[in-house]
């Protein structure tokens, strides 16, 4: 049992490295295919759209609850790797890349939420700690392609695609080979096409979901446009920050806050931790223009590292609240559905920033993200009218 959590965490890290693989090589793709600046938003949204479509299919068919989640994770890793690898094919068009990234996102739906389902099948007590490490692995996996791009900078961008595809395959193999069905797994008895609506009938899940939706408005848009902001900072201050490396560092540091939040969930309520994180990240949104406009790269990087810590710390807490309050027979489906709606929201915020990036001074771009933490805190406040969240 002691080896199970590290195996799940490592597998999650390896397989979710596919998520931002396209973003990490976007500068190279832009030069090779003469892509417009707004392609960044479209590339990120393609993965998110795929993930949403995947989560809807997985949820409606209750795949994670009806079939062995380890095998679901494995086959999803294999198929996501294939779609990811295909991006490196010769004479590929910008549209074809978007379609392939959609396919990668679709099968990521069988990796991220299913990984949480596997963890919840093993750890009834200390679930917050387990999910803290697990989502920390997701964050690190998301950041990892930026590090690979930085380390392999002199080499062709296709090496980044190769590396992430191979890592995802290894992650899937580790799960199916060494992580059997958990002791708390309760198999679903059949397909339930009304499950989407049933999830939000539970007040405790609904409150946690509202907080999560506010969190998601901010998170992926911040991650997606972080390299853009760093490049803009370089241009207005005539600096030469390593955009890929610092994008990795700022995103990856969130894995630490996820893990720490998970450990603290044994002493403090998940709601309290999530509320604190939302408050800090909301403040970061509001003061971001001041920090981007000033010319000290040290000050900016410290600020963005703090933001990187705060923007992710609440994520495992929301997943913990959903998992703890969902019926055992539909826990995986509940997590998948809440994820699906959350990622739908990320598309709106990403495309909004994509639109604004060509119409307003980029210094003010992240102000829009402040709406998420505010609404998230309001959503969590609904708990005061019911005591279901623990």
Q: Model-found features: residue ranges?
A:
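A late C-terminal transmembrane helix in Major Facilitator Superfamily
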Residues: 325-360
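Helix-to-loop junctions at the C-terminal end of transmembrane segments
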Residues: 55-68, 258-270, 357
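Conserved MFS/SLC helix-loop-helix module at the cytosolic interface between two early adjacent transmembrane helices
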Residues: 55-93
């Amino acid at each position: 049992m002691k080896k199970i959590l590290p195996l799940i965490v490592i597998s999650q890290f390896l397989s979710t490295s596919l998520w931002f693989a396209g973003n990490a090589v976007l500068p190279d793709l832009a030069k090779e295919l003469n892509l417009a600046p707004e392609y960044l938003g479209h590339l990120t949204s393609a993965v998110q759209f795929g993930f949403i479509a995947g989560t809807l299919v997985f949820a409606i068919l209750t795949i994670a609850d009806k079939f062995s989640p380890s095998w679901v994770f494995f086959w999803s890793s294999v198929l996501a790797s294939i779609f990811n690898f295909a991006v490196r094919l010769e004479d590929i068009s910008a549209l074809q890349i978007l379609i392939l990234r959609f396919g990668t996102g679709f099968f990521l739906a069988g990796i991220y939420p299913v990984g949480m389902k596997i963890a919840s099948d093993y750890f009834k007590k200390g679930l917050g700690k387990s999910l803290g490490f697990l989502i920390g692995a997701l964050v690190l996996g998301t950041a990892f392609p930026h590090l690979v791009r930085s380390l392999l900078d002199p080499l062709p961008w296709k090496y980044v695609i190769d590396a992430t595809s191979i890592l995802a395959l290894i992650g899937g193999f580790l799960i199916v080979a060494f992580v059997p069905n958990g002791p708390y797994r309760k198999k679903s008895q059949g397909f339930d096409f009304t499950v989407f609506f049933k999830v939000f009938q539970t007040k405790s899940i609904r409150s946690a979901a509202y907080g999560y939706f506010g969190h998601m408005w901010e998170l992926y848009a911040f991650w997606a446009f972080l390299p853009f902001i760093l490049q803009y900072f370089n241009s207005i201050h005539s600096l030469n920050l390593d955009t890929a490396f610092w994008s990795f560092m700022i995103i990856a540091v969130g894995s630490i806050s996820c893990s720490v939040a998970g450990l603290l969930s044994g002493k403090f309520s998940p709601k309290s931790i999530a509320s604190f994180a939302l408050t800090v990240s909301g403040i970061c949104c509001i003061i971001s223009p001041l920090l981007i406009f000033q010319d000290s790269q040290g000050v900016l990087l410290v600020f963005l590292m703090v933001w990187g810590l705060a923007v992710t710390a609440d994520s495992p807490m929301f997943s913990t609240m959903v998992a703890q309050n969902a019926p055992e027979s539909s826990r995986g489906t509940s997590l998948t559905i809440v994820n699906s709606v959350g990622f739908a929201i990320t598309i709106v915020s990403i495309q909004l920033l994509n639109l604004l990036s060509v119409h307003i001074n980029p210094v003010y771009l992240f102000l829009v993200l402040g709406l998420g933490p505010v609404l998230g805190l309001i959503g969590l406040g609904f708990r005061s009218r019911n005591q279901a969240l623990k």
